[in-house]
């Protein structure tokens, strides 16, 4: 599996819009997408971390380089103070409870 972790800084008051925008990714049924998680930090509610999981590196980059993803990304940027800080990489361990 492959994915990214991104640090994002949301504009004030856009929490609900950010959650709705992330739901649009789920509704898009992106080929190879496994899961997405958004964390809102306790000590700074405007700071969010996004974790995205794909089946493999090829699926991740096929999505990242698609015009559809570019359009989704541009909509997401409207809710952020600036571009996310991306950290792409191979997922080397997974544990699921239950």
Placement of each model-derived feature along the sequence:
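An amphipathic, aromatic/His-enriched active-site/gating alpha helix that lines ligand/cofactor pockets
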Residues: 24-35, 53-87
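Glycine-rich beta-strand-turn "strand-cap" elements at beta-sheet edges
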Residues: 2, 35-46, 74-98
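Short, surface-exposed ligand-recognition loops at beta-strand->loop->(often short) alpha-helix junctions
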Residues: 7-18
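Short amphipathic alpha-helical segment that frequently serves as the phosphate-/nucleotide-binding helix
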Residues: 19-23
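Short, well-ordered beta-strand segments in beta-rich or mixed alpha/beta enzyme
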Residues: 2-8, 35-66
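Intrinsically disordered, low-complexity acidic/polar segments
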Residues: 15-17, 47, 59-61, 95-98
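Non-catalytic surface loops within mature trypsin-like serine protease
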Residues: 10-12, 54-56, 90-93
């Amino acid at each position: 599996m492959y994915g990214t972790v991104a640090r994002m800084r949301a504009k004030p008051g856009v929490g609900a819009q950010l959650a709705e925008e992330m739901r649009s990714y789920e509704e898009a049924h992106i080929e190879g997408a496994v899961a997405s998680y958004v964390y809102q930090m306790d000590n700074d509610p405007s700071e969010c971390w996004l974790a995205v999981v794909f089946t493999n590196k090829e699926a991740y980059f096929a999505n990242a380089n698609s015009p559809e993803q570019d359009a989704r990304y541009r909509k997401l940027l409207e809710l952020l103070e600036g571009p996310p800080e991306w950290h792409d990489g191979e997922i080397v361990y997974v544990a699921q409870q239950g």
